[in-house]
């Protein structure tokens, strides 16, 4: 039965840099009640605020632990913890019958991701993965162009997803235990998701990756800060993804993403985060972004599915929006193969 009353959404953790943005988006949505908890925030060595302080700064109701968060009876939860802590929160949500939107990557290990998918399926709860670039109008146009056959058969894709190293605001991104790696884990998955959507979930066949720590070497981080990943898919399609933390710290924007698809009849390139007006000020470059709020579109898609699915029923499939947990597993398989390839210096077969 669908949900007609205001929907109750929990936010589990402020560890991820996207958490505050999701919260602000939700606060502006009608028919949504919010509650957040960030129990690990007080002990995190971050310069930016977390926990009750961050919640208060954006006007977000807050409780101190996940027991109180789930006792509130949420219909849905957005999991924005450190990557290695996703599984525990998602499995608890499944046990409580709470629909889940999980930040990317789904987990740090494929076995954990598969367990999360299985737990949500058994409990009848939604498991959606936070890949907002799928909702960019530029990607929609590219997908429609490809589906219409205008590019012919795609045989090569070049993706870039570069950004600033997030060490100042959230140090765990450079901790291999909590993040699962560095730049490859952080940035390969967005382009991998777009390719997954364009190919209808085609599996990767081989992955060859190279990574190093030349960028930001002065920061003494334990994870890779630069990487290049080459993927061969079942059809023979070849894709490369530059996933480096190569955006300068002083840049006026966090970074960006590009995707160029080449087929037998032509090629199209998109740059979803390019729209802005800019200039110069006394402190340097000025950049004012505009355009579609893809985070809002992602959350809209999730909440629409939650409303239409209603309360979870064990063993009964809900309305699952895309990208779902299966997409999360497939994209993590690519990241995992890239990590292994970079370690051994050779291609890895999936």
Name each region found by the language model.
Residues 1-57:
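N-terminal Rossmann-like dinucleotide-binding module
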Residues 47, 57-119:
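Beta-loop-alpha module in the N-terminal Rossmann-like domain of NAD(P)-dependent dehydrogenases
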Residues 10, 29, 52, 60, ...:
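C-terminal glycine/acidic-rich active-site capping loop/insertion
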Residues 133-220, 345:
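Predominantly a Rossmann-like dinucleotide-binding segment in NAD(P)-dependent oxidoreductases
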Residues 5, 193-274, 299-311:
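Contiguous beta-strand/loop segments that form the cofactor/metal-binding neighborhood of enzyme cores
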Residues 64, 102, 127-129, 270:
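Hydrophobic residues in well-ordered beta-strands that form the structural core
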Residues 115-133, 152-157:
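Rossmann-fold dehydrogenase core element
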Residues 1-3, 68, 76-78, 234, ...:
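C-terminal helix-rich "cap/oligomerization" subdomain common to oxidoreductases
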């Amino acid at each position: 039965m669908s949900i007609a009353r205001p929907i109750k959404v929990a936010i589990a953790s402020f560890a991820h840099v996207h958490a505050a943005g999701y919260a602000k988006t939700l606060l502006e949505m009608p028919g949504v009640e919010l509650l957040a908890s960030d129990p690990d925030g007080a002990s995190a060595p971050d310069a930016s605020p977390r926990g009750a302080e961050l919640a208060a700064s954006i006007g977000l109701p807050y409780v101190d632990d996940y027991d109180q968060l789930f006792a509130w009876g949420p219909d849905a939860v957005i999991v924005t913890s450190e990557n290695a802590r996703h599984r525990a929160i998602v499995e608890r949500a499944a046990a409580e019958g709470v629909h889940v939107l999980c930040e990317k990557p789904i987990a740090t290990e494929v076995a954990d991701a598969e367990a999360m998918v299985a737990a949500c399926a058994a409990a009848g709860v939604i498991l959606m993965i936070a890949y907002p670039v799928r909702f960019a109008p530029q990607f929609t146009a590219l997908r429609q162009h490809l589906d219409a056959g205008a590019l012919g058969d795609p045989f090569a894709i070049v993706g870039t997803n570069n950004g600033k190293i997030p060490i100042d605001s959230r140090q765990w991104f450079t901790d291999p235990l909590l993040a699962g790696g560095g730049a490859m884990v952080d940035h390969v998955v967005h382009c991998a998701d777009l390719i997954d959507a364009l190919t209808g979930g085609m599996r990767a066949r081989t992955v060859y990756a190279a990574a190093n720590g030349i960028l930001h070497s002065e920061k003494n981080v334990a994870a890779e800060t630069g990487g290049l990943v080459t993927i061969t898919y079942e059809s023979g399609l070849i894709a490369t993804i530059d996933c480096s933390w190569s955006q300068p710290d002083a840049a006026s924007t966090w970074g960006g993403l590009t995707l160029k698809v080449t087929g037998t009849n032509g090629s199209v390139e998109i740059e979803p985060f390019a729209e802005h007006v800019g200039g110069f000020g006394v402190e340097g470059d000025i950049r004012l972004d505009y355009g579609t709020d893809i985070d809002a579109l992602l959350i809209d898609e999730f909440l629409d599915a939650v409303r239409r699915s209603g309360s979870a029923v064990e063993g009964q499939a809900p309305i699952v929006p895309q990208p779902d947990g299966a997409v999360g597993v497939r994209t993590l398989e690519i990241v995992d193969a890239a990590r292994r390839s970079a370690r051994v210096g050779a291609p890895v077969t999936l």
